[in-house]
């Protein structure tokens, strides 16, 4: 499907349209200006040039594949009906129906995208045996089917495969009917009668997609805007539900809400309003397209007033179909911070675009993840063969989010983790391998004791133990977690196998930097006062008495933490680079006009401007924070060369390195207690304080719009249009590193 500009004129609804969308009145009924239309043409041309639309031939191939899958499941159900002794009439009437959902159903899929598909079958055809065993075997024997991978234990059980090269995610729902009609109305609540919760989740993918299209004023404008923002999210590294960011349905719901608030806006306007709204949204107030409805069927719906677990959701985005659920329960404190920064980045770029100071390409600039941090966790995944690696990687990736949550939990939210959704493969290695990475940074604006240490050896052990409990584990499957310094990152994570010349990190920060004249510098521009940047000054101190790798052990829990010294530690890892964090940051709320008060109070993050961080490693990593930059350092020690053990495919490889170190303290510091291994807790059980999980308090515990209750009126219209967002100013502090034995 291609896009053009022919719909800009006649497709807009009338300005005084009587139909209302959403749970609040629109923020603006304004239509596009001539400048908006011009920018919209440029945006759509950019999306086409970027190859985001598939050809007509590819569209026809997808339709043919869906027709073929429909034939297969119909034959499968008839075969089972006959084998189970039903009458000839029942065999003749036996039926299964295929529905699509996700990006394909919403019309925003691109070339090579998978097709989210749901098979609805009769009550006597079950998921556990009939779908995941019998249908699986039928598909496995077909030449058209490749990379068949069942995931029966997923939150939404799914069978993944490629059919004639097109990726398919096939779900199954057995409803309480002996015969499934071909014209089944899946949006009716009656399909949910007498089904289990996995079936409800499977059915709701289609039900949510249909509801979204019904709840937006103009679905063509919605589709273009969503296609644009999904592409932006992938470029900025925040498109992944499994790692704690947002997936396709989350982005669709966020875009749909903006379409409701600006019903007459075209895509170029909606993209701008998207960033304007969500940089000012008061999380954890929920985003909802319609009111949450109860039903006599009795399924639990999202309601933080009644459900204790719902109060710990940080970024609730509620699905519009019964039973209404939070589609973004995976979001953690760390990933919410990253997404908030990226929203600010997008908002600043859009302000520049509207002033004709930037082009659309600036919005979609790739986020340089491997230049953003000094510390990274590397998670290496290995398996015996390609099929095992596919299954093992999917399992480890699904648990990767838990590592983020556990680190937040065990450091009381003082260490933030930025998981990178993309996987990386070292093609130079002969064994089957892939790797994921996570950036590490001390949380901004958190209080803490001087030189505090955080022990996460037990955290890493706990993560590895949970991962190794994989139900379908096979010999050869293994996972390794290690710290790497930025300049020790493996070459295969960089384009063409080599890192590009170092640039000022201000070019990669979301939101750019504010100069003295008030102008904002984005990627591609350099703030003069930060133009000169020192090279990495971190040094390392290695003592040679323990050259070999050893398994990490969880430290004993301590009830008292020293006010002078404490740290962060991970187990059996190579040396880790120093962590850097921005100093004090303050985002002021935008002042609206006199007709209304603030749209929202933006969070103020206060932190020590002179903080300095150090990592210490003894087959472990230790992050140390000192608030006084003038604190005297210990003397520099230059040891002899020593063997540092690196993990390669489960084997040890000795690497001779000459390392130096600057020590911050002459004595070992007590460690913050770590959680013992073997605990398997949900995010809701991590014990975050209510102040962190629900900072808005009772007053805003359940606000329908996410905005201040006194602002839910038409007086917001002019205020939103006149708001001026300010970019946050960040700088980076020096940090040191040392190795302990």
UniProtKB/Swiss-Prot annotation:
GO terms for cellular component: nucleus. Pfam families: PAP_central, PAP_NTPase, PAP_RNA-bind. Its EC number is 2.7.7.19. Its cofactor is Mg(2+); Mn(2+). Binds 2 magnesium ions. Also active with manganese. The keyword Nucleotidyltransferase applies. ATP binds at residues 101-103, 113-116, 169, 230, 239, 248-249. The keyword Transferase applies. Disruption phenotype: Lethal. Mg(2+) 2 binds at residues 114, 116, 169. Residues 534-551, 721-731 have a biased composition (Basic and acidic residues). Essential protein. Polymerase that creates the 3'-poly(A) tail of mRNA's. Also required for the endoribonucleolytic cleavage reaction at some polyadenylation sites. May acquire specificity through interaction with a cleavage and polyadenylation specificity factor (CPSF) at its C-terminus. Monomer. Forms a complex with cleavage and polyadenylation specificity factor (CPSF) subunits CFIS2, FIPS3, PAPS1, PABN1, PABN2, PABN3 and FIPS5. This is Nuclear poly(A) polymerase 4. It comes from Arabidopsis thaliana (Mouse-ear cress).
């Amino acid at each position: 499907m291609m896009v053009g500009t022919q719909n800009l004129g006649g497709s807009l609804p009338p300005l005084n349209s009587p139909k209302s969308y959403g749970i609040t009145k629109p923020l603006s009924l304004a239509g596009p200006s001539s400048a908006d239309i011009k920018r919209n043409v440029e945006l759509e041309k950019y999306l086409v040039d970027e190859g985001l639309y598939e050809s007509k031939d590819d569209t026809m191939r997808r339709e043919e594949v869906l027709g073929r899958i429909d034939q297969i499941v119909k034959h499968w159900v008839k075969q089972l009906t006959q084998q189970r002794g039903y009458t000839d009439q029942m065999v003749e009437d036996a039926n299964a129906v295929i529905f699509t959902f996700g990006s394909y159903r919403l019309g925003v899929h691109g070339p090579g995208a998978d097709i989210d598909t749901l098979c609805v079958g009769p009550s006597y055809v079950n998921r556990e045996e009939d779908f995941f065993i019998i249908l699986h075997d039928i598909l496995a024997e077909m030449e058209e089917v490749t990379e068949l991978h069942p995931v029966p234990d997923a939150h939404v059980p799914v069978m993944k495969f490629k059919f004639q090269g097109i990726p398919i995610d096939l779900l199954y729902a057995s409803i309480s009917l002996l015969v499934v009609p071909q014209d089944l109305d899946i949006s009716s609540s009656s399909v949910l009668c007498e089904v289990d919760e996995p079936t409800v989740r499977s059915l709701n993918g289609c039900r949510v997609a249909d509801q979204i299209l019904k709840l937006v004023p103009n679905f063509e404008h919605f589709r273009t805007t969503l296609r644009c923002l999904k592409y932006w999210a992938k470029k900025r590294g925040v498109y992944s539900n499994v790692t704690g960011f947002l997936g396709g349905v989350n982005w669709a719901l966020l875009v749909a809400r903006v379409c409701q608030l600006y019903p007459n806006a075209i895509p170029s306007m909606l993209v701008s309003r998207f960033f304007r709204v969500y940089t000012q949204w008061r999380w954890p107030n929920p985003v909802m397209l319609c009111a949450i409805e109860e039903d006599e069927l009795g399924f639990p719906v999202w309601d933080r007033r009644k459900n204790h677990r719902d109060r710990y959701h940080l970024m609730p985005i509620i699905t519009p179909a019964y039973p209404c659920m939070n589609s973004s329960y995976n979001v953690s404190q760390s990933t919410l911070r990253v997404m908030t920064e990226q929203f600010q980045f997008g908002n600043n770029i859009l302000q520049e675009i509207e002033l004709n100071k930037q082009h659309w390409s600036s919005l979609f600039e790739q986020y340089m993840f491997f230049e953003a941090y000094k510390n990274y966790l590397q998670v290496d995944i290995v398996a015996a063969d390609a099929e095992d690696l596919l299954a093992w990687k999917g399992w480890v990736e699904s648990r990767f989010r838990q590592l983020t949550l556990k680190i937040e939990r065990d450091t009381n939210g003082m260490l933030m983790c930025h998981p990178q959704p993309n996987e990386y493969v070292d093609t130079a290695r002969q064994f089957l391998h892939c790797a994921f990475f996570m950036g590490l940074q001390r949380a901004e604006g958190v209080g803490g004791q001087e030189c505090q240490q955080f022990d996460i050896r037990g955290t890493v052990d706990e993560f590895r133990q949970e991962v190794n409990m994989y139900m379908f584990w096979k010999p050869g499957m293994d996972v390794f977690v290690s710290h790497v310094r930025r300049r020790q990152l493996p070459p295969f994570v960089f384009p063409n196998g080599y890192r590009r010349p170092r640039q000022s990190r201000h070019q990669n920060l979301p939101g750019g930097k504010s100069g003295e004249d008030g102008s904002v510098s984005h990627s591609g521009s350099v703030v003069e006062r930060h133009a000169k940047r020192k090279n990495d000054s971190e040094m390392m101190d290695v003592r040679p008495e323990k050259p070999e790798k050893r398994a990490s052990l969880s430290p004993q829990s301590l009830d008292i933490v020293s006010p002078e010294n404490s740290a962060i530690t991970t187990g059996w890892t190579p040396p880790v680079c120093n962590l850097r964090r921005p100093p004090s940051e303050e985002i002021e709320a935008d002042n609206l006009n006199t007709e209304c008060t603030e749209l929202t109070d933006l969070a103020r993050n206060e932190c020590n401007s002179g903080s300095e961080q150090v990592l210490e490693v003894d087959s472990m990593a230790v992050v140390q924070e000192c608030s006084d930059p003038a604190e005297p350092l210990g003397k520099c020690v230059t040891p002899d060369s020593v063997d540092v053990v690196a993990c390669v495919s489960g084997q040890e490889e000795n690497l001779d390195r000459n390392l130096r170190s600057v020590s911050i303290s002459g004595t070992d510091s007590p460690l913050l207690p770590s959680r013992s291994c073997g605990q398997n807790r949900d995010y809701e059980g991590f014990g975050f304080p209510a102040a962190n999980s629900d900072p808005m308090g009772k007053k805003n515990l359940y606000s329908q719009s996410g905005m201040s209750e006194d602002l839910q009126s038409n007086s917001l219209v002019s205020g939103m249009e006149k708001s001026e967002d300010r970019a946050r100013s960040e700088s980076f502090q020096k940090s040191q590193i040392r190795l302990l034995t």
